[in-house]
Amino acid sequence: MAKGKDVRITVILECTGCVRNGVNKVSTGISRYITEKNRHNTPNRLELRKFCPFCYKHTMHGEIKK
């Protein structure tokens, strides 16, 4: 039996380095990843270290609102 609907939701992770720097002067764009999270296990905002092709390094990517 399922306890509830929509336990796993799709979230968008955005590079915090690109947003903070106002997008690099060299290239335009902001790195975004799409992933899923379980609301019961992680009720707060998700933050992961992912590779940003615009910053050319691994940076923190935080969950954004849809």
Swiss-Prot record:
Main location: plastid
InterPro entries: Ribosomal_bL33, Ribosomal_bL33_CS, Ribosomal_bL33_sf, Ribosomal_zn-bd
GO CC, any one term: ribosome
Domain of life: Eukaryota
A Gene Ontology biological process term: translation
SUPFAM superfamilies, per the entry: Zn-binding ribosomal proteins (SSF57829)
Record keywords, A-Z: Chloroplast, Plastid, Ribonucleoprotein, Ribosomal protein
Protein name: Large ribosomal subunit protein bL33c
Gene encoding the protein: rpl33
